[in-house]
């Protein structure tokens, strides 16, 4: 793809390159953001990093990136750190398959206690009392929700824009939109804000 003068090289994660970590602990936030999900999970399970380390790295990255691309307009820091504190990721612990990995959830899917707008002003201030079963299952397996990713209104759109949060920008070219309806999820992954980001597909969003 030809280079663009509007490409955010400073924030893109080079997905074509190996992200395997070299060296010894402790690992820094910037290093963690360049790892793949399975590599971070392995480090968590070996006790070389903690869920709190991952959250620190993720939120630092989110704070750096979000003013430019608007991929994850809602975060839930207190909830995330509380979840991390409750996990036991020791060798004999029961943190689950994800072992404390930070994840993002598309803003069409309710997360208990976290603003969920569905991308529409009709639900601009909606805070659900219960999580969607998908979220509950991910959390039961050690996933830690850090925020909600942007989506078109009610997921019905080919571009990631809504009247609540505005447009998400494509980190490869900020004159473009990453598309819908999981554009916020895609942009959050491309920029290394999180290692796993939930998306949904009714008419081609993930295809």
Where are these regions (language model features)?
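Hydrophobic face of alpha-helices
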Residues: 52-56, 102, 135, 139
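Long amphipathic alpha-helix in the N-terminal Rossmann-like dinucleotide-binding domain
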Residues: 78-85, 142-143, 152
């Amino acid at each position: 793809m030809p280079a663009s003068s509007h490409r955010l090289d400073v924030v893109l994660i080079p997905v074509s390159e190996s992200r395997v970590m070299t060296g010894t602990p402790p690992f820094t936030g910037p290093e963690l953001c360049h790892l793949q999900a399975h590599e971070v999970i392995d480090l968590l399970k070996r006790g070389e990093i903690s869920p709190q380390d991952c959250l620190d790295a993720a939120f630092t990255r989110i704070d750096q990136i979000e003013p430019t691309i608007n991929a994850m307009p809602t975060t839930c820091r207190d909830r995330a750190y509380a979840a991390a504190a409750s996990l036991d990721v020791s060798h004999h612990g029961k943190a689950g398959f994800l072992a404390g990995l930070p994840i993002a959830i598309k803003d069409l899917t309710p997360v208990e206690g976290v603003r969920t707008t569905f991308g529409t002003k009709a639900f601009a201030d909606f805070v659900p009392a219960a999580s969607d079963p998908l979220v509950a299952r991910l959390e039961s397996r050690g996933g830690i929700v850090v925020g909600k990713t942007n989506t078109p209104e009610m997921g019905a759109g080919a571009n990631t824009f809504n009247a609540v949060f505005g447009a998400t920008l494509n980190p490869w070219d900020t004159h473009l939109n990453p598309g819908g309806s999981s554009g916020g999820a895609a942009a959050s992954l491309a920029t290394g804000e999180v290692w796993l980001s939930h998306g949904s597909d009714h008419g081609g969003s993930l295809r």
